[in-house]
């Protein structure tokens, strides 16, 4: 109950779903008209809650996201959320088009995967979206949430919660396509949620009673059996704003890089066995200098982007272990990667440099723009031509 309320509150606080990767999406507005070939996916899904995922077939993590989207679809259907249309739009670039079959293979026929025509207007551009973005529309085709990294990672519950909100809550007003069956289902969901409100209250009072006697029991302040020392709830503790654990850098060594300790311990507790070298790397974090190529529209050439990924989440999928960044990074960077053996391989998704970078006329050190980000101050400094 409280977990759901926390997620809903976090989603409310996120501006347009917290997606930093795109310009401000028009909340509760109809999706702009877009077609792929002679098909109109949004028109075809009218009357259902529509989930549009912008995934890149040439990206390993995107393939993993597609597989997780299929798992999420099955999970929601098992919970009774049936009237949902799932749409995946592949990137328009040639590398992604060549690997389109790999992307389509990750999902069932219940999820439509569209290949863009390179001669048509880029759908991602029309939707103000970037790689790994999720756009959730209500039954009338109005945008309820636009989630970008890191909130769109399906290892987090934000996409699932956003879909449920779009399904049962009238965030954008009434919709004539809402059926009586959907209203009855949502009423039952609301009643079931309300019936659980008394249970946490009673449990909370019970814990308060025991807290008063905590010093009498062995004089111990050890964490509970199910709690790792210094651990956080990964699913619900992700801050909804830019205030992402900056204070960790000022605490003593035992609390420094708390996200790493949490991730490693969490993985081990779930049967994910990491080697000693992997655990050391996990605590050290992934800090790589990565080269990025900005979009041609920005008029900028290749730039250098420093991604500092300090709060890692490890998850095993098949024979691979994925390493994901669970924090806000400078607007220029987005870290994600594959944790293989003793190395963290990061890829960097570049965005247009912040306005502050454009205003700084520093003598260039290279033939191309060079933007570096200070991990402590979370500020970017750019040398432009």
Swiss-Prot record:
GO cellular component, one term: extracellular space
Phosphoserine modifications at: 269
Glycosylation sites: 83, 174, 188, 365
Coiled coil: none
Tissue specificity statement from the Swiss-Prot or TrEMBL entry: Widely expressed, mainly by the liver. Secreted in plasma.
Keyword terms: Disulfide bond, Glycoprotein, Phosphoprotein, Secreted, Selenium, Selenocysteine, Signal
Sites marked Not glycosylated: 370, 375
Entry's Gene Ontology BP terms: brain development; locomotory behavior; post-embryonic development; regulation of growth; response to selenium ion; selenium compound metabolic process; sexual reproduction
Pfam families: SelP_C, SelP_N
Cysteinyl-selenocysteine (Sec-Cys) cross-link, renumbered residues: 59-62
Signal peptide: 1-19
Disulfide topology: 168-186, 172-175
Localization of this protein: Secreted
Disulfide bond as UniProt keyword: yes
Region Disordered, annotated ranges: 196-262, 357-385
Basic residues biased stretches: 243-258, 376-385
GO molecular function, one term: selenium binding
Stretches with biased composition (Polar residues): 360-369
Free-text function comment from the UniProt entry: Might be responsible for some of the extracellular antioxidant defense properties of selenium or might be involved in the transport of selenium. May supply selenium to tissues such as brain and testis.
Domain characteristics, as noted in the entry: The C-terminus is not required for endocytic uptake in the proximal tubule epithelium.
Similarity field: Belongs to the selenoprotein P family.
Note: Plasma contains 4 isoforms, which are named isoforms Se-P10, Se-P6, Se-P2 and Se-P1, according to the number of selenocysteines they contain. All isoforms arise from the same mRNA. The 3 shortened isoforms terminated at the opal stop codons at positions 264, 282, 371, when selenocysteine has not been inserted.
Name of protein: Selenoprotein P
Organism expressing this protein natively: Rattus norvegicus
Classification of source organism: Eukaryota, Metazoa, Chordata, Craniata, Vertebrata
